[in-house]
């Protein structure tokens, strides 16, 4: 199942996999930027799904969105370039 997320700063991402560190077994989110050169990133899973405080309001660092929402946001971003 494809999973898409929007970062609290506005970037769009596709979650590629949940990976485990070979030594510590710590889990990481592996995700692809859906903008620019499409860089692949990793982040500890607990950080990926954490909340951040923006001017006193807690918001999800990465908010899960549907594929339809992702396509609408991508189209909107491309129109502003």
Question: Which stretches of residues belong to each language-model region?
Answer:
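Mixed-charge, low-complexity intrinsically disordered regions
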Residues: 1-81
């Amino acid at each position: 199942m494809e999973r898409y997320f929007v970062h609290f700063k506005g970037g769009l991402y596709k979650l590629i996999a949940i990976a485990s560190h070979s030594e510590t077994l710590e889990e990481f989110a592996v995700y692809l930027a859906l903008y620019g050169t499409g860089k692949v990133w990793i982040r500890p899973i607990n950080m990926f799904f954490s909340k951040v405080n923006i001017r006193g309001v807690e918001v999800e660092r990465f908010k899960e969105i549907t594929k339809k929402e992702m396509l609408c946001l991508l189209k909107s971003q491309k129109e502003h370039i």
